[in-house]
UniProtKB/Swiss-Prot annotation:
Pathway(s) annotated for this protein in UniProt: Sulfur metabolism; dibenzothiophene degradation
Taxonomic lineage: Bacteria, Bacillati, Actinomycetota, Actinomycetes, Mycobacteriales
Annotated localization: Cytoplasm
Protein known as: NADH:FMN oxidoreductase
InterPro entries: Flavin_Rdtase-like_dom (IPR002563), NADH-dep_flavin_reductase (IPR050268), Split_barrel_FMN-bd (IPR012349)
Length: 161
């Protein structure tokens, strides 16, 4: 191993060595599905049920979601590599080709994912060029038959057996 500078490029490469799951955060805004993808998801607490993810402060999608009463979190499965890229795109229909389910609360979920978490924002924590979004979970749906997708070194991968 060798020392490397702390440039954003070097940090992104270093952080990319840590494998992570991928989630979609989505809701309906004035009848339109709005969502984004994140690979910085973490369970936080069982009592109360809290989870968190990080969002870039430069996101143009987050301002549309951050004041809503309910958000849908879908934990993407290994069949969702294309969906993850589409949801992370800066332009275009992020839900193209995806089957979704909307709840009366406005939360939107992607069908065929491993877990749905309906949630509401509990706390926003400024953290450098990102914001840590802490969410209180109000409902869960688990689909144990769906294996997860993993984001590692800028690529989507499947877990080995």
């Amino acid at each position: 191993m060798s020392a490397t500078d702390l440039s954003p490029t070097s940090l992104r490469e270093a952080f990319g060595h840590f494998p992570s799951g991928v989630i979609a955060i989505a809701a309906e805004v004035d009848g339109t599905r709005v969502g984004l993808a994140a690979s910085t998801f973490v369970p936080v607490s069982l009592e109360p049920p809290l989870v968190a993810f990080c969002v870039q402060n430069s996101s143009t999608t987050w301002p549309k979601l951050k004041d809503l009463p309910s958000l849908g979190i879908s934990v993407l499965g290994e069949a969702h590599d294309t969906a993850a890229r589409t949801l992370a795109a800066k332009t275009g229909d992020r839900f193209a080709g995806l089957e979704t389910e909307s709840r009366d609360s406005g939360a939107v979920f992607i069908n065929g994912t491993s877990v749905w978490l309906e949630s509401a924002i509990e706390q926003l924590v400024p953290a450098g060029d990102h914001t840590i979004v802490v969410l209180r979970v109000s409902d869960i749906v688990i689909n144990e038959a769906v294996p997860p997708i993993v984001f590692h070194r800028s690529a989507f991968r499947k877990l080995g057996a």
